[in-house]
Amino acid sequence: MPLNEVSGNAFPRTVLFDLDGTLLDSAPDMLATANAMLAARGRAPITLMQLRPVISRGTFRIIAVAFPELDAAAIQGLIPEFLQRYEALIGSVSKPFDGVEMMLHALECAGTVWGIVTNKPEFLARLILPLLGWTSRCAVLIGGDTLAERKPHPLPLLTAAERIGVMPTDCVYVGDDVRDIQAARAAGMPSMVALWGYRSHEDNPMTWQADTLVEQPHLLSRPDVWPST
């Protein structure tokens, strides 16, 4: 029996994950960063409830929540400060979502190769890997600035598959944002929505045309939950 077959059900040969909101609950670190910027200006902090729905939308949206009165140019001007402060705080309070380690262990035991494709700047994503013990386990890491394009463009997913040495159709991509699913569909990869991630009230994953929607990470420890590749 091949390594990735268990009781007649197969894990995928390769799985690619989004990072923030899929593998990592990074909202606490980002909240601390935004509130440090507010405190430096003598302003009141924001709450996790305010910030959580936009975490997957990137730094610009996070700053926009913290400083709603600013125009786009002013928000853009604060991005370097946010990234510098975030780099100093990264990993201090964030952790994998419950069930993620169980899932990764099950994949590894089945012989499945896994990697990360995120829109987070690559240097920040690489800082996280050793903190979680993932450096040698993660087969590929593509950040939002690694290539000329980022999600929802398919290039990051296609490049990740190429670097691992598999066809895109042999991969499954798991993410919590509509751009993740758009990128996977454009790359020809089966996709799964991580419903535990960072979504706003306006988001409706049922309309994203993913292959599967999954409620919790631990469910992905079962081979029968995964779409066929």
From Swiss-Prot:
PANTHER family linked to this entry: PHOSPHOGLYCOLATE PHOSPHATASE
Name a single GO cellular component. Answer: cytosol
Q: Where does Mg(2+) bind?
A: D18, D20, D176
Give the EC class as a word. hydrolase
> What UniProt keywords are attached to this protein's entry?
Carbohydrate metabolism, Hydrolase, Magnesium, Metal-binding
Pfam families according to UniProt: HAD_2
Q: Which reaction does it catalyse?
A: 2-phosphoglycolate + H2O = glycolate + phosphate
Query: What the protein does?
Result: Specifically catalyzes the dephosphorylation of 2-phosphoglycolate. Is involved in the dissimilation of the intracellular 2-phosphoglycolate formed during the DNA repair of 3'-phosphoglycolate ends, a major class of DNA lesions induced by oxidative stress.
The EC code for this enzyme is: 3.1.3.18
For whether the record's keyword set contains Hydrolase, the answer is yes
One of the protein's GO biological processes: glycolate biosynthetic process
Q: Which cysteines are joined by disulfide bonds?
A: none
Annotated family:
Belongs to the HAD-like hydrolase superfamily. CbbY/CbbZ/Gph/YieH family.
| Essential cofactor(s) | Mg(2+)
Q: What is this protein called?
A: Phosphoglycolate phosphatase
Catalytic center residues: D18
NCBIfam families tied to this protein: HAD-SF-IA-v1, HAD-SF-IA-v3, PGP_bact, PRK13226.1
Organism, scientific name: Xylella fastidiosa (strain Temecula1 / ATCC 700964)
Q: In which pathway does it act?
A: Organic acid metabolism; glycolate biosynthesis; glycolate from 2-phosphoglycolate: step 1/1
Any one Gene Ontology molecular-function term assigned to this protein's record: phosphoglycolate phosphatase activity
Cited Gene3D superfamilies: HAD superfamily/HAD-like, Putative phosphatase, domain 2
